[in-house]
Regions:
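Conserved beta-strand scaffold positions in the cores of enzyme catalytic domains, especially
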Residues: 1, 67, 137-139
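Conserved aromatic-histidine-acidic binding/catalytic patches
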Residues: 18-22, 91, 115-119
Length: 167
């Protein structure tokens, strides 16, 4: 189980294995929408994401690539990783399908060949492999700002009602 699951379960490893899937379903959900529902694409957005810009512009970025991801808005940690599962996009094309299946399979097989070297953080650490293993990966961060309740305190609110979100 991930570090977060062990932490939330107060060190109970068996309980951690169970609760890890509570917040790590984006991979399976995305794969299911592409593979079983045959949707043109899937844009997964966590319910607790805060946007600095109108989130409807996310729709405009579908042509930027087959796989879209966002960076964490906290200082880099090897446990949490560079990217965040808060917003993930897959197009129903060769690269998008392969990547969503890869991500789902990593989560379902905790002994996969990447888990030890990359860590897991539920399903989040595998996002670091997307630009390495797949083509047409783009980052939304250059276009739309985002935060979540757990990262709000790490950012500066400026007098002109802007939020500094440089990292």
């Amino acid at each position: 189980p991930s570090y977060e699951a062990v932490n939330v379960s107060s060190g109970d490893i068996e309980r951690a294995k169970e609760i890890q899937f509570t917040w790590a379903m984006a991979s399976y959900f995305s794969w299911y929408c592409i593979e079983k529902l045959n949707l043109e694409d899937i844009l997964y957005v966590d319910a607790d994401i805060y946007f600095f810009n109108d989130p409807s512009i996310l729709e405009d970025f579908k042509d930027f690539g087959s796989i879209g991801i966002i960076e964490n808005r906290v200082e880099y940690s090897p446990v949490n990783g560079k990217y965040n599962v808060g917003i993930v996009f897959f197009k129903n094309d060769k690269s998008g399908r392969k990547c969503s299946e890869f991500w789902k399979n990593c989560l379902l097989n905790s002994k996969n060949k990447y888990a030890e070297g990359y860590g897991t953080c539920g399903d989040q650490k595998y996002l670091e492999l997307f630009p390495v293993l797949f083509e047409d990966v783009f980052e939304y961060d250059n276009f739309i700002g985002h935060l979540a309740p757990w990262s709000v305190n790490n950012h500066m609110y400026l007098p002109d009602k802007k939020i500094s979100w440089g990292g």
